């Protein structure tokens, strides 16, 4: 049986970003194919994003090409869900 690769992507924006830009970043993340849920969080990161992809390669492309390419995103950390 085929199983999708699921991950949590922790996203950090620039520390001086305005609330308006944060909302824009969240809206842009929500548009990315494969994004299932987006949460604003407190702490070192600004967003926790649940994503789904067919392969680990597709997951890598989703993060590097799509999420990291959004204006305002300065850093991501990806946690692949194992169980």
Label every PLM stretch briefly.
Residues 1-83:
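A compositional/biophysical signature of low hydrophobicity enriched in polar/charged and small residues
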């Amino acid at each position: 049986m085929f199983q999708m690769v699921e991950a949590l992507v922790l996203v950090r924006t620039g520390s001086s970003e305005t609330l308006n830009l944060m909302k824009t970043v969240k809206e842009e993340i929500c548009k990315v194919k494969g994004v299932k849920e987006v949460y604003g969080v407190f702490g070192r990161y600004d967003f926790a994003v649940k994503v789904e992809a067919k392969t680990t390669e597709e997951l890598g492309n989703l993060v590097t090409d799509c999420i990291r390419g959004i204006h305002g995103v300065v850093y991501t950390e990806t946690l692949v869900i194992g169980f």
